[in-house]
Amino acid sequence: MTKRLLTTILTTLLTAIGLQAASSFTNVKLTVSGMTVTMSNGKTTIKIGSNGRASSMKWGSRELIDGSHGGIYFDYTTAQGNKALSPSDLKIIKQTDEMCEVLYSATSGNTIFQQGYIMRNDIAGVYTYVIATGTATSASEPLKEVRVCTRLASDMLNGYVDYRMNGKLPTNAEMAEAEKNQIQDATYYLSDGSVYTKYNWANFIERDTVHGVWNNNKYGVWNIPVSYEWLNGACDRQELMVHATSKSPITIQMLQGEHLGGAAMVLDEGEKKLFGPFLIYANYSTSPLVNAKRIALEQQEKWPFQWFDNDLYPKKRGNVTGHLNVATGQRNDSVRIVLTQESGTELVTHTHGYNFWTTTDANGDFILKNVRPGKYTLYAYALAGDVTDELQMEDITIGEGEQSLGTIDWTPKRYAKLHWMIGENNRRSDGFHYSDTVRQYGLWNLPPDDLTYVIGASKPEKDWYYAQTKAGTWTVRFNLDELPRGNAVLTASLAGCTNAGSTVKVNVNGKEVDTWKPGVNDAAIYRSAVNAGRHWLFSTSFSASKLKKGTNIISFTMSGNGKNGGFLYDCVKLESGEAITSGISDIQTDIQKNNDTGKNKSLFNLTGQRVTSSYRGGTVCEGGKKVNYNK
C-alpha cells in the first residue's frame, strides 16, 4: 500500500467519525456579502448572518455550534421580555492578514447595542465584544440580563465550570422530558427523579478563568473572559456559566445580570460601556480542558490586548500599589481591595463603569494591575478575621504608569471587648455546616428549625449552618464571668437574604432588642447558592444590663421567609465596652504626607471618607466629613 493511499484512507476514516484535524493557521480571510460575514484562519471558520448571529463555527470540517437555535448570539432581558440585537448596520473595522474585525450595530432602542466579532491568525475561535450606549429613554427599560450565548452541537455534553462543578450534562432528549416536569425557573425533575437546574452550574466571577463544554471526540468550545473588569457587580458577583436545554447545550458569557443579588442596569444618556473583548475558544485536543486552561492563562498575560483599537479601550493603563494599615490592631492581611466607578452602595449592585480588585498580602500590601485611567472609589473589606466594617475612599484618580496610594490608615468600628464570634468575616457562609457542598437544589431542607449553639463547646462547621431557612429559633448560649458596663453590640454579617419577607427577631435573655429584615430577595437559597447572595450588615446596640453574670441566651427567630427563603450567615459576634473608632479624617495618611511634599500631585485629587454598611444594608457616613488630601 502506498503512503499516499494510506493517507487518503486515514483521512476518509477520520472525517467519517468527525476527527479530522484542522490545518495550520493561515492568514485571516474575510468575505462579506451584504450583512453576511464569513471569517476563516485555517483552523476555524465562522459564518455570521445579517442578524448578527453566528450560525456556524467549524474546526476544520467539524461543526461545533447549533446555528438552528441561534449559534453565537447576543441578547438581553427587560421587564418586557427577551430581545435580540436587531442590527441595521455592518462595518468592517479592520481587515489585515493578522486579523479582521466587524461591527454589527443597532441604531434604535432605549439602550443602543453593538456587537463586534474579531478573528486572529494565532488563536482558534472568535473574540467578541458588546458596546452599550445609554439614551434619554434608557430608564424606561432597565436591563435585567445582558449576555452572549453559544448554542453547542448536541454531543457537547461534558461541562466544566470549575474543579468542583463539572461533569455530564443531560442530553437534549432528556431535557425535553424534564421540561415537562418543571419545579421552578430553569429547574426540572429528570426521569430518574433527580433534579436538574442551571443554577447548579453558576460560579463566582473571581473564580472563572474558563468555562465550557467538550464532546467525547475531544472537540471543545470555551468561554475565556480574559478580564472581568467590565462585568457589573465586581468580584463577589455570581453568574451562570454552562447549562443544558432541550434545544442544545449552552455556554453563557454574562455581561450584566440580576442573578443572586445583582441589580438592573440603566445607563445615563450618552454613557457608553464596553463589555469585552472575550474569547470564544475552539479546540481539538487529547485533553480539551487542560488545553483550554493553558490558553486562558496565556490570554490573561496578554491583557490589555494591544491589537484591539477602540476609543473605549485604553491600552495604556496604571499599576496601582498601596499599603493598608488597620489602626485598631486587627488583621491587615486578606483584605479585599476594589476600585470601582460607583460609590455608596453594595458592590454587587454596581452597574456603571469598570472594576478592579485584589487582596492584601501578609504585610498589608496590595497591587492592582492594568487599571483603566479614570476616577474611582476604593472599597476595602476583610476576607478573614473579625472586621465587619467597610472602608470607602472616593475620588481617587488613576492615570497611566506606576502609581502608589501610599499607606491607607483604616480605623474600622471595634469595641473594647469581643466576647464571642461565630464564623469569620468574609461575606460568605464558608466554615459553616454544608457550606462546602457543591451547589445543589434542595440543600435548604437540611438546616434544622431550631438549634442551640454553645460558645466554647459547639463547632461552627458542625453546629451552625450555612443558612437559617425555616421558621424557628436559633439560640446562642454563653457564659459571662462579669457583667459588662455600658452598651453591648451584637453584629451579624449576612452573606445573603432570600425572599423579601425574611425577618429575624433578636432576643437577649428573653427580651426583644431588634428586628433584622433586609427586605430584598437575592434568590440565592432557592437558586442553589451555598456561600452567598447579596451582603448585608446588621448591628444592634443594647444596654449591657440585659446581660447577666453566668449563663446568657441570645436567640434569632426566623419568620416570613416563605418557601425556600431565609438568611445566609457570614458571621455573628458580640462585643461590649467603649467604641474604638475614629473617622479617617482624624488620621494623617502617607498619601497626605506625599502630597505635602509635592509627591502624587499627578495622581490624586481625592477626598476620603469612611463609610460602612448601615444596619439596613445601605451606607452611612462615619464622621460626616470629607477630607481633601491635596490641601
Question: Where are the regions that the model predicts?
Answer:
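Extended, loop-rich substrate-binding clefts of extracytoplasmic carbohydrate-active enzymes
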Residues: T31, D75-T135
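Acidic-aromatic substrate-binding/catalytic surfaces of carbohydrate-active enzymes
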Residues: V32-D89, M99
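A contiguous, surface-exposed recognition patch within enzymatic or periplasmic domains that forms
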Residues: R151-E271
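A short, amphipathic beta-strand motif
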Residues: G318-T328, G364, I408
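Short, acidic Ser/Thr/Gly-rich low-complexity loop/linker segments typical of extracellular
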Residues: T345-D365
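A short, solvent-exposed beta-strand micro-motif common in secreted/extracellular proteins
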Residues: G364, G374-G385
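Structured interaction patches on ligand/partner-binding surfaces of diverse proteins
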Residues: L383-T407, T411
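Beta-strand-rich ligand-recognition modules
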Residues: A471, N479, R485, L494-A579
